[in-house]
């Protein structure tokens, strides 16, 4: 039994290991300051949200074949729509007040303010990740479901391009997805710590626990 074997192995590990939690070690951690930014939906987003509700009603009533539409597809489309309407249709306008553009302006402001000390920023984005597919984690692939196939728009590239247009040097912006080996990750994290890379964009799966910057 694999589960019993795993439990036995963990039991043996605890016999020789001295396990301490973060609370027991009293490790110094910076105090986080949270700021919630609220943006208003576009007219197109409001219309598409209504369409999502209609699709959900059809699914729940059994009026649509699950192979055609289902709650997983609807939820995936809702996540994309909540981030940027161009993830649903790349031909829709780039709303100046969108979440992505609000993020870009904020990141650029902090980048300017931190010039002297070479301060760095991490941007987390779990959908519309670069190189979706073989390099993507299962969590990321949930954001790359039906409807995004063939969609040329990508949030990571959009943020990077806009920051470059606003004056951020290209070499100061990096994607965690480009560091596809432990050696490359180590080199990238060193550049972030030194301020050579000042904006690092990644997903929770690839840039969450274990990231040392």
How does the language model describe each region?
Residues 160, 164, 169-204:
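Conserved helicase ATPase core of P-loop NTP-dependent helicases/translocases
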Residues 9, 92-104, 151-156:
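Phosphate/oxyanion-binding active-site loops and adjacent basic polyanion-contact surfaces
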Residues 116-118, 196-197:
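Short, high-confidence coil segments that cap the C-terminus of an alpha-helix
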Residues 119-127:
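Conserved RecA-like ASCE P-loop NTPase motor core of nucleic-acid helicases/translocases
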Residues 129, 205-207:
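Alpha-helix capping/helix-boundary segments
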Residues 211-213:
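A short beta-strand element within the Helicase C-terminal
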Residues 128-175:
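Conserved helicase motor "Helicase C" RecA-like lobe of SF1/SF2 P-loop NTPases
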Residues 1-93, 97, 109:
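Inter-lobe coupling linker of SF2 helicases/translocases
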